[in-house]
């Protein structure tokens, strides 16, 4: 069995782009391939008890607490203090794989609109410089924190309204799970674990726990950011309901462990079935062999019975070879032909001698 960290990624790695040269093998083993998403520690990432955030909260009071945490973070980072501002967070390695080349293409447009952007992380120099530049260009809208702080990451999860993850590929992803836990709605590209853990918002039936876009395209990403911002400002009720649904999701390790338990139980049952199938096959083969032996013994017994009956009746039970041999013996007993009389070769010289021979050969007359 082969396991990976999400169902979608288990499908993706069967394709050349994601398979890294192993796609052919993984396609051949597709029936043995499973995907189970990672979990996060719900004790560590718990807005109700988190000591690193300004105001603790739960599902019951998340809306008010979000505004208070946002204001506290704005003050900490030197952003404009506005609880109604649309705050977008990024906590990530700053690399191409995380989709930051898409962000680079449209960052000017994002910052020019009514959006606050908070970035935390380190990585490639070009992205570090990019965010630093925009934080200086838009000091009240962009905060670039080019380092990593666990405590600050918790405050970003608790304070932001949305969390951006436009990854090129993402086997599972953890940041979107943390943001869901804190009621921050993920904006993700539909790949790997991001597809499996974030349900895109559907305004028709009022479902969803975040926002998503399909193609690896900067303008498609920008469009979904604008859609999220529009929903936040124009339909706050739908937004707040989505926040509640997000917080009620269970992506704890307990949930992941239950999935692994099901997988391993299935493997145990599968192995038991395999062994039982082998046992039944062996039993079937043994029964077939015993049946053949019984049939052979029955045939021998039948022949012995027939032979005994013939013997009791005075009939020799001759085999074909025996009958052939008997015929040959009888043929040898045929009477021999009588020998022909010997030819008379004596020469008679006188009439008296001839008369004497005739007299001897003539049978005597009975009186």
Residue ranges and their predicted role:
Residues 1-332, 343-349, 353-367:
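Catalytic cores of nucleotide-sugar-dependent glycosyltransferases that transfer UDP/GDP/TDP-activated
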